[in-house]
């Protein structure tokens, strides 16, 4: 018989009798793992007392996998089997990654996905990321002395549905239970906010190795509320390295590079970038030829990239509806914020000094560990509530190729929101549901996420059916959609798990286009809505005439048909006003007919019944 042990209320639990949970910063360049130990969030070191694990793997012969620092030397000697910056490939299609510049890997198309051809076989980005997560998991279990119960894993705030799902899949493959996916700037804000205790509105500027995020948050009485987010999931330190790579190739007039030479230049360029943060120039040998770049030239090249981040920052401030003067602190996160020009230009934008005092490499992992502790139910003096937001609007296609937005961008998540729709035609027994993402008014200008069908709708007159469609976005930012026909109770649902998702360029373009074409979109939407109404009116009139033509004399019938044909002839034109007038004329010509049909229906309903029955 198993006995349950219950300790005395006054006894202190032994260390690690509670659940062991961790926070992981799965970065483009480096990854870290942290845990709350004795009430303090601390980064867990490896056996060499190193905090960071370089996000690099080498696939060797005889299935020998090397992760982290030990994999670096292979980048030069075996570049096609040494994968760096795998985070950039997460949730991407083959078409998207094939546009990446200076890519030394052998990529294989597998449906919508991309595989890396290595000596260990064809591997996906999910599998490669899983090996990095597995290494961090092993480090944590060795240090904490037990089996982990779960982890909070951070992702860029601007990661789309596919990229988030890929991250969760990688964790599952690594044997990690994902307690929550947490946006990187939010994690940084948690660590900073609890450390400083300073309430108010803060901006988190997060420029990492491969991604950029900007978040505007309000911290008040233990509640972190994200007001707005922005970013670019394909802009980071790697792009600053590319500036030096391209300058080197141009300066030395290099026409072609082997994969090994490309990896060598990449490593030297990264070192040069870091050197220029402290010195006026950097030089190295490129294919046995000397190359030198000055700090001034690098900053001239880098300004273009930094300005891109500032444009996104301004947009986030507008979305948050806050005055820049009311933002108390600008917290700099991510290794790329060590570039002096980045801090200088961000400081100029906000007209105040930025906070660089916290370790930009460790703060995200520490914040994730704090949140993991809370989700595991481990009591703390600093329990907090995180309220994150959705980066882009979600909606459905309606008649006329229009988009009906169900959840708008920058809405706090998790959230459930529902809306009722109806049928367009008499006797319609099925409905096709098309889920979209974006800010524009028309389907053709938004991104398709999924399509599914609802069958079994009872046949009835158009407009009588009631279909409730519910959108649910969880705390990880993942979407599921359900549809229920209210009368029959027939139901269908789908979890949105696309094999690849939006590139950040597409996201940024969606937002820009939503502003540039706002007026045109509204006019186009109005035209399409009027056209839909015209078609609905024509179908209703045709159906009524087919059933009750005998009620009409020749004159009334001709008047209705003339008005109907006039509308039919212009329904696909671009003249919204003319269509509206034609609809009104047709409805006016049918007033007597509608009255006659109503009277007929009433007479049929009361025929053979007495007053006491009503």
Swiss-Prot record:
Q: Which cysteines are joined by disulfide bonds?
A: none
- Which Gene3D superfamilies does the record associate with it? 1.20.1270.10, 3.30.420.40, Actin, Chain A, domain 4, Substrate Binding Domain Of DNAk, Chain A, domain 1
**Keywords on record:** ATP-binding, Chaperone, Nucleotide-binding
Q: Name one GO biological process term.
A: iron-sulfur cluster assembly
Q: What family does this chain come from, according to its entry?
A: Belongs to the heat shock protein 70 family.
Q: What is this protein called?
A: Chaperone protein HscA homolog
Single annotated GO MF: ATP binding
Q: What does this protein do?
A: Chaperone involved in the maturation of iron-sulfur cluster-containing proteins. Has a low intrinsic ATPase activity which is markedly stimulated by HscB.
What Pfam families does its record include? HSP70
What NCBIfam families does the database record attribute to this sequence? HscA, PRK05183.1
UniProt xrefs under InterPro entries: ATPase_NBD, Heat_shock_70_CS, HscA_NBD, HSP70_C_sf, HSP70_peptide-bd_sf, Hsp_70_fam, ISC_FeS_clus_asmbl_HscA
């Amino acid at each position: 018989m198993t006995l349950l042990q219950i300790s005395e209320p006054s006894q202190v639990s032994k260390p690690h009798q509670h659940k062991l949970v961790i926070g992981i910063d799965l970065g483009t360049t480096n990854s870290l793992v942290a845990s709350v130990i004795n009430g303090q969030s601390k980064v867990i070191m490896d056996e060499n007392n190193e905090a960071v694990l370089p996000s690099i793997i080498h696939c060797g012969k005889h299935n020998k996998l090397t992760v982290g620092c030990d994999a670096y030397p292979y980048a030069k000697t075996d570049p096609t089997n040494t994968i760096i910056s795998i985070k950039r490939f997460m949730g991407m299609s083959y078409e998207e990654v094939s546009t990446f510049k200076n890519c030394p890997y052998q990529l294989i198309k597998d449906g919508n996905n991309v595989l890396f051809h290595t000596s260990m076989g064809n591997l996906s980005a999910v599998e490669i990321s899983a090996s990095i997560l597995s290494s961090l998991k092993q480090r944590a279990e060795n240090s904490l002395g037990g089996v982990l119960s779960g982890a909070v894993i951070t992702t860029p705030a601007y990661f789309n549905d596919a990229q988030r799902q890929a991250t969760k899949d990688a964790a599952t493959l690594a044997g990690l239970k994902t307690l929550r996916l947490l946006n990187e700037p939010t994690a940084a804000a948690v660590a900073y906010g609890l450390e400083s205790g300073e309430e108010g509105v803060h901006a988190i500027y997060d420029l990492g190795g491969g991604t950029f995020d900007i978040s505007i948050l309000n911290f008040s009485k233990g509640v972190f509320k994200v007001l707005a987010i922005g970013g670019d999931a394909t802009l980071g330190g790697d792009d600053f390295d590319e500036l030096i790579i391209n300058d080197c190739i141009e300066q030395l007039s290099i026409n072609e590079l082997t994969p090994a030479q490309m990896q060598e230049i990449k490593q030297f360029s990264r070192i040069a970038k870091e050197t220029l943060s402290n010195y006026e120039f950097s030089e190295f040998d490129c294919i046995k030829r000397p190359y030198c770049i000055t700090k001034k030239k690098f900053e001239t090249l880098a300004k273009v990239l930094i300005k891109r981040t500032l444009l996104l920052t301004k947009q986030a401030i507008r979305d948050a509806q806050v005055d820049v003067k009311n933002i108390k602190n600008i917290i700099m996160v991510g290794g790329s914020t060590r570039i002096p020009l980045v801090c200088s230009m961000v400081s100029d934008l906000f007209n105040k000094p930025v906070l660089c005092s916290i370790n930009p490499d460790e703060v995200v992992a520490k914040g994730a560990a704090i949140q993991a502790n809370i989700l595991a139910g481990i009591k703390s003096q600093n329990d907090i509530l995180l309220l994150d937001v959705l980066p882009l609007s979600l909606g459905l296609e309606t008649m006329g190729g229009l988009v009906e937005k169900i959840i708008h961008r920058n809405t706090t998540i998790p959230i459930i929101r529902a809306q009722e729709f109806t049928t367009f035609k008499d006797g319609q027994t099925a409905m096709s549901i098309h889920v979209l993402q974006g800010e524009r008014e028309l389907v053709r200008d938004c991104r398709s996420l999924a399509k599914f069908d609802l069958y079994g709708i009872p046949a009835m007159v158009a407009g009588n059916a009631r279909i409730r469609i519910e959108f649910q976005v969880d705390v990880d930012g993942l979407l599921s959609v359900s549809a229920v026909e209210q009368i029959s109770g027939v139901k269908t649902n789908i979890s949105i798990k696309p094999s690849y998702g939006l590139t950040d360029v597409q996201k940024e373009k969606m937002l820009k286009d939503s502003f540039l074409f706002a007026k045109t979109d509204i006019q186009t939407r109005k035209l399409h809505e009027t056209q839909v109404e015209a078609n609905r009116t024509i179908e209703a009139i045709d159906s009524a005439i087919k059933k009750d033509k005998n009620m009409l004399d020749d004159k009334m019938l001709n008047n209705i048909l003339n008005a109907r044909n006039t509308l039919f002839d212009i329904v696909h034109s671009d003249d919204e006003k003319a269509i509206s007038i034609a609809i009104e004329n047709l409805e006016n010509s049918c007033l007597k007919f509608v009255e006659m049909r109503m009277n007929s229906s009433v007479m049929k309903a009361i025929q053979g019944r007495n007053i006491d029955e009503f």
